[in-house]
Regions:
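Juxtadomain coupling helices with adjacent low-complexity linkers
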Residues: 10-14, 124-146
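Anionic group-transfer/hydrolysis microenvironments
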Residues: 89-90, 123-125
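Sensory-domain boundary capping and coupling elements
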Residues: 111-124
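Short hydrophobic/aromatic beta-strand element in the GNAT-like acyltransferase core
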Residues: 42, 107, 119
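Intrinsically disordered, low-complexity terminal regulatory regions
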Residues: 1-57, 144
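A short, aliphatic-rich beta-strand micro-motif
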Residues: 104-111
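Regulatory sensory and allosteric helical modules in signal-transduction proteins
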Residues: 48-100
Length: 146
């Protein structure tokens, strides 16, 4: 059960990141934990640098390194400062295809003092892989980082 996996993972991640002050180390461990627990196709972070998102720690195939504000799923989640669940990436206007194997996606903004400082991006190689359960728990995980 997906929700049980999240419930087990959350306290572990909270303990892990609350004792480490280095952002990159925390992002790397969160990406690894999510990939290991759920077997997602791609899990990673993009960090805001001026008018672009720049690739941070990730688990999975080689990824796009820069995404402009408002472009694709990640750039749109940044612009709108909200979680986006995309059941079929082919149907998302302006989707940036880093990998043709990516079929569905969820992007969760990381906020500091109300400003988006990065996003958590998770891709699945199956359609319709993400729902409000994922959104709720991934948003909580992102509060540990922000």
């Amino acid at each position: 059960n997906k929700e049980e996996k999240y419930r087990e993972l959350l306290p572990q991640l909270h303990a892990l990141v609350s004792t480490e002050t280095d952002l990159i180390a925390n992002l790397a461990n969160v990406a690894a934990a999510l990939k290991q627990t759920f077997g997602f196709f791609w899990v990673g972070f993009y960090l805001v640098k001026e008018d672009e998102l720049v690739l941070g720690p990730f688990q999975g195939p080689i990824a796009c390194t820069r995404i402009r504000f408002g472009r694709g799923v990640c750039g749109t989640a940044w612009k709108e400062a909200r979680t986006l669940i995309v059941p079929d990436v082919e149907q998302f206007p302006g989707h940036i295809a880093c990998s043709s194997d990516s079929k569905s996606e969820i992007v969760v903004p990381i906020l500091q003092q109300g400003e988006v400082v990065g996003v958590l991006d998770i891709d699945s190689n199956e359609l319709d892989s993400f729902d409000t359960i994922d959104a709720r728990y991934l948003e909580e995980i992102c509060t540990y980082i922000g």
